[in-house]
């Protein structure tokens, strides 16, 4: 099960520590740290999402990976073996902050909640509004309001 870190609102001390350690090096290279995802499993994964105004290519990911690896090797915050992945947010862009939702008002989003609302954890609809830490999504013509803290995972739904 993935653990997400919303910049500014951490799920755990580890996610906070990781973001504090890698945010400055990522930004020093000229990229935005969109968010991180730490997936705990038999082979754990630390996934770092980066972006820039010019987009992201493989060389950008490699540069950030080398820089972040060096920081993590020195600080050694993760006590289990893990794989490091660096990528762009991609077409199914993950949403981490209230600002991300605000930027994509009018776009379709798939949301997985930590705790069910109306006996449902999975929702898909159009982002209508953001009010502080509350996100309004229009689902089948009806507005549903979710607390950002209750969102386990959310991604844009691309249309082709």
Curated annotation (Swiss-Prot):
It comes from Enterobacter sp. (strain 638). The gene is rimP. One of its GO terms (cellular component) is cytosol. Signal peptide: none annotated. Belongs to the RimP family. Required for maturation of 30S ribosomal subunits. NCBIfam families: PRK00092.1-1. Transmembrane segments: none annotated. One of its GO terms (biological process) is translation. Keywords: Cytoplasm, Ribosome biogenesis. The lineage of its organism: Bacteria, Pseudomonadati, Pseudomonadota, Gammaproteobacteria, Enterobacterales. It is found in: Cytoplasm. This is Ribosome maturation factor RimP.
């Amino acid at each position: 099960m993935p653990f997400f870190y919303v910049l500014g609102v951490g799920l755990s001390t580890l996610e906070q520590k990781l973001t504090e350690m890698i945010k400055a090096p990522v930004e020093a290279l000229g990229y935005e740290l969109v968010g991180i995802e730490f997936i705990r499993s038999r082979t754990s994964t630390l996934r770092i999402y980066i972006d820039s105004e010019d987009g992201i290519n493989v060389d950008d990911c490699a540069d950030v990976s080398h820089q972040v690896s060096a920081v993590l090797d020195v600080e050694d915050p993760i006590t289990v073996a893990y794989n490091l992945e660096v990528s762009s947010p991609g077409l199914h862009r993950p949403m981490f902050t209230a600002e991300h939702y605000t930027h994509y008002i009018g776009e379709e989003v798939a949301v997985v909640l930590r705790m069910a609302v109306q006996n449902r954890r999975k929702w898909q609809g159009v982002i209508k509004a953001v009010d502080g830490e509350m996100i309004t999504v229009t689902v089948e013509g009806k507005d549903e309001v979710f607390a950002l803290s209750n969102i386990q995972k959310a991604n844009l739904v691309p249309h082709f």
